[in-house]
């Protein structure tokens, strides 16, 4: 049986990794030869979850057409966020919870996108719909994905469906969602030992906003100053990325997991759009974004609207 690769976006977060594992397992149970893979490094937060539930991380691939003809995308759909050679393979399915942009296919496909906080929430439904029992370890990873994407249920993207799914999965996994979740988020917020290049690419996504090319990277911290003390070095590596990719804006967002506020570091010729979008003034290229924790709901649509205004 021909193999199908299942993967999330480049610079994968916990949902991208864990949902690839969970969906590949469901597809295998349903008779498909599916393998989860990843398009980037595993973050400290994700590694904590993998270690906790004793699951091996997916192998890394840069290209997919050299291995398979067919792929399944989870937690993304935009071409620039996917495998470098995504145009050379057939996308069989997409399971996602983001905006749909820069995506088209030559054939009809199974496309499931729901306005929930996490791909794993959708997968929880799909396991039930197919009558497949979720293994304890996989339930733990799916729970981890929901906790990560919802910032332990505090993000505005978090829905009642996400909370209900997390409670169900926590029971299967045999953990206390709140206690485990805080441990996992703290592990992810430990940025010691990371280079500046790693910091700005840990969870970075590229977007087309009108005619502008924008990259938004986000890291969680217990104290934003722990990251911003390195601002000069960060600006140097961000400026290099802006030049290399021809970006109009690179927004580096440091989110405080305790206060649920963020600080944005804006570099690029369109940095003023951040001021316009949030009605703030950049001082030394930074501004506090009160109550902003979600890239998907509080940053991407707000900046997109500002660019198009």
Swiss-Prot record:
Its main location: cytoplasm. Mn(2+) 1 binds at residues 9, 13, 75. It catalyses: diphosphate + H2O = 2 phosphate + H(+). InterPro entries: DDH_dom (IPR001667), DHH_sf (IPR038763), DHHA2 (IPR004097), DHHA2_dom_sf (IPR038222), Mn-dep_inorganic_PyrPase (IPR022934). It comes from the Bacteria. It is found in: Cytoplasm. Pfam families: DHH, DHHA2. Mn(2+) 2 binds at residues 15, 75, 97, 149. SUPFAM superfamilies: DHH phosphoesterases (SSF64182). Its EC number is 3.6.1.1. Binds 2 manganese ions per subunit. GO terms for cellular component: cytoplasm. GO terms for molecular function: inorganic diphosphate phosphatase activity; manganese ion binding. Gene3D superfamilies: DHHA2 domain, inorganic pyrophosphatase (n-terminal core). Keywords: Cytoplasm, Hydrolase, Manganese, Metal-binding. Its cofactor is Mn(2+). Belongs to the PPase class C family. This is Probable manganese-dependent inorganic pyrophosphatase.
């Amino acid at each position: 049986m021909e193999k199908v690769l299942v993967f999330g976006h480049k610079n994968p977060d916990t949902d991208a990794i864990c949902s690839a594992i969970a969906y590949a397992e469901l597809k295998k149970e349903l008779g498909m030869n599916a393998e989860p893979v990843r398009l980037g490094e595993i973050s400290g937060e994700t590694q904590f979850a993998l270690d906790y539930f004793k699951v091996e991380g997916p192998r890394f691939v840069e290209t997919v057409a050299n291995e398979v003809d067919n792929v399944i995308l989870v937690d993304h759909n935009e071409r620039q966020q996917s495998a470098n050679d995504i145009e050379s393979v057939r996308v069989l399915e997409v399971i996602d919870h983001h905006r749909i942009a820069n995506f088209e296919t030559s054939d009809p496909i199974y496309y499931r996108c729901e306005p929930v906080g996490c791909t794993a929430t959708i997968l929880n439904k799909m396991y039930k719909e197919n009558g497949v029992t979720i293994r304890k370890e996989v339930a733990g990873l799916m729970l981890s994905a929901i906790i990560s994407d919802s910032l332990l249920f505090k993000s505005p993207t978090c829905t009642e469906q996400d909370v209900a799914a997390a409670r169900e999965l926590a029971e299967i996994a045999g953990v206390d969602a709140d206690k485990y979740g805080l441990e996992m988020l703290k592990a992810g917020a430990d940025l010691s030992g990371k280079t500046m290049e790693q910091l700005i690419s840990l969870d970075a996504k590229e977007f087309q906003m009108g005619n502008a090319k924008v990259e938004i990277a986000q890291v969680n911290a217990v104290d934003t100053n722990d990251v911003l003390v390195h601002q000069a070095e960060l600006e140097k590596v961000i400026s290099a990325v802006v030049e290399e990719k021809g970006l109009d804006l690179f927004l580096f967002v440091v989110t405080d997991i305790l206060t649920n506020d963020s600080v944005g570091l804006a570099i690029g010729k369109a940095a003023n759009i951040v001021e316009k979008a949030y009605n703030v003034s950049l001082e030394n290229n930074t501004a506090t974004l009160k109550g902003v924790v979600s890239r998907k709901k509080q940053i991407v649509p707000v900046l997109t609207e500002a660019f198009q205004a």
